[in-house]
Amino acid sequence: MASLKDMRVRIASTKATQKITKAMQMVAASKLRRAQNAAEAARPYAEKMDTVISNIASAAAGSPNASPLLAGTGKDQVHLLLVCTGERGLSGAFNSAIVRLARDRAFALMNQGKEVKFFCVGRKGYEQLRRIFEKQIVETVELRTVRQLGFVNAEDIARKVLARFDAGEFDVCTLFYSRFQSVIAQVPTAQQVIPLAVEDAARSDGPAPSYEYEPEEDEILNGLLPRNLAVQIFRALLENNASFYGAQMTAMDNATRNAGEMIRKQTLIYNRTRQAMITKELIEIISGAEAV
C-alpha cells in the first residue's frame, strides 16, 4: 500500500496535469472561433468554384481538347492519396480518423490490383502512415512552422501534386481531410480532385440555362482547373484547422474532467488511509495506557 507521502505526491501531480489540460482547453477555445469562421467562409467559394466548373465542363463535354485534370488519363491504375492531417496531437481521434479513412481506401484499392501512393500533409498523418506504407509515401509537407494558414500554402501543395500528375506518376488523386461540423463533430472526408468529379449541373426542375463562353470552354478550364485544385486543398486545410481545435478543446475538456474525478478519488483514499492510521495509533496508545 502506498504511503501518505506517495499519495500526496500523486494528488499534486494530478492537479498540475489538470491545470495544463485546462489551459490547453482555453487556448483551443480561443483559437477555435477564428478557425471556424475561416473554414465556413471558404466553403461557399470552393462550392461555387465546383459549380462553375461543372457548368463549363457540361458545355465542353466530349471535347477532344479537354484538360487531363477534367478528362483524366484514360485509366485509373495508379492512385495518389493526398492525406491532410495535423502537426500536433492531444486532439482525440482527429488525426487517426483521417488516417483510418485513407488506410481503408488504400487497402480497398490494392485489393483491386491498383497501385497506391501517398502524399502526406501534416506530421501526425505521416508518422502513422509510414508504419504500414513507408515505401509508398512519395512526398511529405509539414506546416508546423506556419503561424497562419494562407492560400500560398495550398498553392505550393497543388503545384507539387500537379508536377507529379504532369510527369505521369498517377492517374487519380483523392484528397482526405476532416470536415468541421461542430465542436464535438468532425467528419473524415474523401474528395476526388483529379480528375475532377463533375457534378450534375442541371439540378433544378426547369431547363438548364444556356451560356456562351468567351474564350472557349477548354481554354477557360485550363486556367480554372489548376486553381480549383489549390482552392479545394486550401479549403481542406482550413476545415482541418477548425476540426483540430474543436477536437482538442473537447479532448482537453474530457481530460480536465477526468483529472478532477481522479483527484476526488485519490483524496478520498488519502483521507481514509490517514484516518485509519490515526485510529490505529490512538488504539495503540489507549491499549498501552490500560496495560500500565
UniProtKB/Swiss-Prot annotation:
GO MF term list: ATP binding; proton-transporting ATP synthase activity, rotational mechanism
Listed InterPro entries: ATP_synth_F1_ATPase_gsu, ATP_synth_F1_gsu, ATP_synth_F1_gsu_CS
Membrane topology of this protein: Peripheral membrane protein
CDD domains: F1-ATPase_gamma
Cell inner membrane keyword on record: yes
Domain of life: Bacteria
Subcellular location, record wording: Cell inner membrane
Keyword terms: ATP synthesis, Cell inner membrane, Cell membrane, CF(1), Hydrogen ion transport, Ion transport, Membrane, Transport
PROSITE patterns listed in its UniProt record: ATPASE_GAMMA
One GO CC term, this protein: plasma membrane
Pfam name, any one: ATP-synt
Gene Ontology terms: biological process: proton motive force-driven plasma membrane ATP synthesis
Role of this protein: Produces ATP from ADP in the presence of a proton gradient across the membrane. The gamma chain is believed to be important in regulating ATPase activity and the flow of protons through the CF(0) complex.
Family from the record: Belongs to the ATPase gamma chain family.
Assembly and interaction partners: F-type ATPases have 2 components, CF(1) - the catalytic core - and CF(0) - the membrane proton channel. CF(1) has five subunits: alpha(3), beta(3), gamma(1), delta(1), epsilon(1). CF(0) has three main subunits: a, b and c.
Stated name of the protein: ATP synthase gamma chain
Organism: Nitrobacter winogradskyi (strain ATCC 25391 / DSM 10237 / CIP 104748 / NCIMB 11846 / Nb-255)
Source lineage: Bacteria, Pseudomonadati, Pseudomonadota, Alphaproteobacteria, Hyphomicrobiales
